[in-house]
Every structure is written in structure tokens, then in C-alpha cells.
């Protein structure tokens, strides 16, 4: 459903008797909509869908990338102009809506995304006296915190910092920032586990076509794989400004059976995973990529680099095969190893499926609910303290 400028609200209706005793906690989730494919938008959509079933919550959504109304939408097709007008409309909606909620749950990446989307939400939340949860999700956190002057002082203004992995907890601690880890969620029932016997040389990669994700390394590895398995195929799912350059590289490498299919909608990814037999990712820097966990759930063996937080979520030879960054030779060797040792591939796939249960909603649910309720309780205590202070001051004046 299209995301409009106004927030999309969903009040959870409990029984009339419940409503008379318990006032739902009002939470505003602030993140990119699914118009902007990526980890933030997908995680927000998943979390929102689950939280909207909780009778103790009233959840609303404010997209940081609103679709503008009427003729103004044409401005969003103009490079640079779209950033200005979209940001201004988001800021206006933020100012108009944020005061209605008890807790602002703010999804955040790094750099300009943080400065234009998350930072204003933290500042507005503080101005309105609301509790703010900064859900920071970027694998580029170290460079962001170290080199952007606005980052540390404004991140410290958030009441709670939540990150999706122990990797970022440790990284934030180096900057004297206290963060807590709550895993990304994966709805296991969306992914059908498929036993891949025999394991075919049918490969998939599905990262953004940008330098950070080093899809060129995957293509170079695949060139070596095709020398051993000439019938091997590779599907490259994802968009990005490097697409033309990567397509040129595929031609230079004389790759066969290699298809660039562009971005894939969130609800189509289970079919993509099911169509492949091995997943390749060569990212140079990452946090907790949901794509890897989704592969585990689907029984799709993964060959991944050891970048960033990835070793915090999977283990070499237990739930994946892990290689050093930017090493296409090692990636090809690992993929060929799976194809030539199908017992290893099967063992990894089954172990990975069990491992990924820790990322299910049943595991993560209580952590989010307890966090929301603790923030609401603190807000109530602070409000009561201010009221008591006002009464004492009034008595003193009399």
C-alpha cells in the first residue's frame, strides 16, 4: 500500500474491558518505507506488522521518504530536488505528528541519512519531551561516529540506543556510547526449508550494487566457478549506481548464464531464495545482514566474507562458509567445496536452520515490549516528579 505523507496508524483493538483498564502505549516508528528497498525498511515493516498485533500498543508509522501529494510528486523524479522536497515534507510531518506519541522508535543509518532523517527525529523527540529509541543499523558506524561532528552529541541525546548485533554494541562502547543488542527478526514461516539434493551450481547474490557490497568480487569468483562447472548460473538481484559497471565486468569476464534482474520486492524474496542452491555475498563492511539469516531459514547454503558483524551471527563450517574480504579466489574455492562435498552443504543447511530460530519474533518479542514499557514507565515517573516539584513550588510561593 502506498506510503502517504501522513502517518499510517493502526490501533490494536482489545476487548472493551481491556480498553477500560489499560491505555495502549503510543509508539511512532520512523523509518524508510518499502518504496526504498533496504534493511531498514524491511526490518521496520516486519517489526511493525508484529507489534500491531500487541493489544498493549498503538503503533503508527512515519516514513522518512513520504510520497508527495498530487503534482508535487513529479518533483521527486528530479535528482537533488527530490532530496530537498522529500526531506522538508518529512520534517513538517515529524513536527506535526511526534507530539501525539509516548515513544519515538527511530530507525537510523549513517552519514547524510542520519543527519536528514534520524537526527531531526531525536531532536524533535527531546523538544516534545518524548522518549526516543535510536535503532542504529549501519555497518559504517565507526567511520560515522569518528568523522562526523554532529553524530556523537546527538546520538547521546537518545534515551536508548538499540543495535542489531553484539558487533555494534562493542563498537559503540569504544565511543563511550551504551547500546543494547536486539536481533533483526526473520519470520521463519515465510521461508520454506528446501533440502537441496543434489546441490546444483545455481547461485544467487542480492546486495545493493554499490562499492560497499563488492559485487565485483562475486562476479570474479563466479568466473572461476564456471571453469569448474560450465553450466553454473548466477542471478544478481539488486539495484545501485554500479549496475552498468558490473554488467560490463560480467561481459569482460565472459560470464555465461548470468542475469541482472534489478531490485526484488520484499515479498518476492522467499521465491528468489528457493530458486537458488548457493548464496554468495562479498560485502566489505556490514552489520547484521538480514539476507544471510533469511538464507539460513530457507536452507540456502551461504558463502560470505567475514566483514563487520557477520561473524557475530554465523560461524564458519557450522552455519556457513566464511572467507576473508575481497578474496574472489577463496570465495570460488568455498563454493566449489560445497558442490563437491554435499554432505557438508547439507549439514551446514540443517544447522543453520536451527540456528536462525534465535532471530524469530517469538525470541525477540519480549525484548521490544519490555523496552517500550520501561521507557513509558520512566516517562511517567519523570512527569510525576515534575508535577510534584510544581506543587512544592506553588506551596512555597503561597
Predicted features and spans:
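Conserved donor-binding/catalytic core segment of Leloir-type glycosyltransferases
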Residues: 26-30, 195-226, 235, 239
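Donor nucleotide-sugar binding/catalytic pocket of nucleotide-sugar-dependent glycosyltransferases
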Residues: 155-192
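Nucleotide-activated donor-binding/catalytic signature segment of Leloir-type glycosyltransferases, i.e.
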Residues: 247-264
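Short alpha-helical donor nucleotide-sugar binding micro-motif in glycosyltransferases
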Residues: 263-264, 271-276
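Aromatic "clamp/platform" in nucleotide-sugar-dependent glycosyltransferases that forms part
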Residues: 284
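Short hydrophobic beta-strand element within catalytic cores of glycosyltransferases
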Residues: 301-304, 314
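Conserved acidic donor-binding segment of nucleotide-sugar-dependent glycosyltransferases
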Residues: 316-317, 321-328, 337-342
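A short, well-ordered alpha-helix in the C-terminal region of glycosyltransferases
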Residues: 330, 337, 344-358, 367-370
Amino acid at each position: 500500500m502506498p506510503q502517504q505523507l501522513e502517518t499510517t496508524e493502526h490501533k490494536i483493538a482489545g476487548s472493551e474491558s481491556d480498553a477500560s483498564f489499560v491505555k495502549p502505549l503510543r509508539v511512532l516508528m520512523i523509518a524508510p518505507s518499502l518504496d526504498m528497498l533496504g534493511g531498514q525498511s524491511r526490518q521496520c515493516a516486519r517489526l511493525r506488522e508484529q507489534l500491531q498485533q500487541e493489544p498493549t500498543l498503538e503503533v503508527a508509522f512515519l516514513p522518512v521518504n513520504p510520497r508527495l501529494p498530487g503534482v508535487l510528486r513529479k518533483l521527486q523524479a528530479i535528482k537533488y530536488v527530490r532530496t530537498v522536497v522529500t526531506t522538508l515534507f518529512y520534517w513538517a510531518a515529524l513536527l506535526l505528528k511526534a507530539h501525539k506519541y509516548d515513544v519515538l522508535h527511530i530507525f537510523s543509518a549513517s552519514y547524510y541519512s542520519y543527519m536528514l532523517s534520524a537526527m531531526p527525529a531525536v531532536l524533535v523527540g527531546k523538544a516534545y519531551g518524548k522518549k526516543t529509541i535510536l535503532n542504529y543499523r549501519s555497518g559504517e558506524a565507526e567511520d560515522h561516529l569518528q568523522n562526523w561532528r554532529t553524530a556523537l552529541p546527538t546520538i547521546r541525546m537518545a534515551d536508548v540506543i538499540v543495535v542489531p548485533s553484539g558487533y555494534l554494541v562493542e563498537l559503540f562502547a569504544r565511543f563511550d556510547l551504551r547500546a543494547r543488542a536486539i536481533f533483526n527478526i526473520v519470520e521463519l514461516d515465510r521461508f520454506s526449508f528446501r533440502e537441496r539434493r543434489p546441490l546444483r551450481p545455481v547461485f544467487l547474490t542480492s546486495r545493493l550494487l554499490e562499492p560497499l557490497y563488492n559485487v565485483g568480487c562475486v562476479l570474479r569468483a563466479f568466473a572461476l566457478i564456471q571453469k569448474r562447472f560450465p553450466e553454473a548460473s548466477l542471478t544478481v538481484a539488486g539495484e545501485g549506481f554500479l549496475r552498468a559497471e558490473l554488467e560490463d565486468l560480467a561481459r569482460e569476464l565472459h560470464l555465461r548464464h548470468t542475469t541482472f534482474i534489478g531490485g526484488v520486492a520484499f515479498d518476492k524474496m522467499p521465491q528468489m531464495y528457493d530458486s537458488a542452491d548457493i548464496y554468495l555475498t562479498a560485502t566489505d563492511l556490514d552489520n547484521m545482514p538480514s539476507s544471510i539469516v533469511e538464507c539460513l531459514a530457507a536452507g540456502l547454503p551461504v558463502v560470505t566474507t567475514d566483514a563487520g558483524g557477520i561473524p557475530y551471527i554465523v560461524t564458519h563450517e557450522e552455519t556457513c562458509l566464511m572467507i576473508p574480504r575481497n578474496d574472489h579466489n577463496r570465495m570460488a574455492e568455498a563454493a566449489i567445496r560445497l558442490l563437491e562435498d554435499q554432505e557438508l552443504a547439507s549439514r551446514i543447511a540443517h544447522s543453520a536452520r536451527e540456528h536462525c530460530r534465535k532471530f524469530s519474533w517469538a525470541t525477540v518479542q519480549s525484548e521490544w515490549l519490555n523496552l517500550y514499557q520501561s521507557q513509558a514507565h520512566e516517562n511517567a515517573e519523570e512527569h510525576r516528579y515534575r508535577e510534584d516539584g510544581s506543587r512544592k513550588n506553588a506551596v512555597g510561593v503561597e
